[in-house]
Amino acid sequence: MPTRPQEPDRAASDPVEPVPEGAGRPPRGDLPQPGPPARPEATNGEPGPDAAGPAPAEDEYTTAIQELEDRWRRTLADLDNLRKRHARELERERAVERSRTAAAFLPVLDNLELALTHAGADPGAIVEGIRAVRDQAVNVLELLGYPRHAETGVAFDPARHEVVGVVQDPDAPPGTVVEVLRPGYGDGERQLRPAAVTVTKRE
């Protein structure tokens, strides 16, 4: 079988034309050079968002916190001053009340000393003098708002009486005060003490 002659390789046989230097690519001076990212420029003479300094919202928040702290400190100072002023006024009122009460009993002491002075000359007069002083002291307590309770024949009242004895008495209904061993003074919230009494019981 006849052999077909091979054709020469055109790519190998064709001469390669040299490419001029710099052809097909931009000059080096036209290549983009890497650099820092561009920042937004200021407009109308105002600093950009990356300018130094806190944001306006942060400034407002800080200012609001400072105002609240100042108000809180002023409120604490006002409360402390109010507490001290109230304590001073309360102590002053107590001192006035103590002075008023003590002054009310000065005449009682004067009459008691007068009765003791005359006791030597007339021993029988001492009883009347002591009774008069007692009545005067009772009147002073009543004027101060503490009336005396020493009644018998009245019904037992737990708000005024304290039972210290129980007896049988056919002439009095049960629960009747038949004897007062110690008078009471005052009523309700202003009670100094209840009266110590003896009451009747059922048979």
Swiss-Prot record:
Region (Disordered): 1-64
Annotated GO biological process: protein folding
Keywords: Chaperone, Cytoplasm, Stress response
Pfam families: GrpE
Matching InterPro entries: GrpE (IPR000740), GrpE_coiled_coil (IPR013805), GrpE_head (IPR009012)
Compositionally biased tracts (Low complexity): 45-56
Subcellular location: Cytoplasm
Basic and acidic residues compositional bias, start-end: 1-12
GO cellular component, one term: cytoplasm
Record carries keyword Hydrolase: no
MF-aspect GO terms: adenyl-nucleotide exchange factor activity; protein homodimerization activity; protein-folding chaperone binding; unfolded protein binding
The keyword Cytoplasm belongs to this UniProt entry's keyword annotation: yes
Function: Participates actively in the response to hyperosmotic and heat shock by preventing the aggregation of stress-denatured proteins, in association with DnaK and GrpE. It is the nucleotide exchange factor for DnaK and may function as a thermosensor. Unfolded proteins bind initially to DnaJ; upon interaction with the DnaJ-bound protein, DnaK hydrolyzes its bound ATP, resulting in the formation of a stable complex. GrpE releases ADP from DnaK; ATP binding to DnaK triggers the release of the substrate protein, thus completing the reaction cycle.
Family, similarity comment: Belongs to the GrpE family.
Self-association and partners: Homodimer.
Record's protein name: Protein GrpE 2
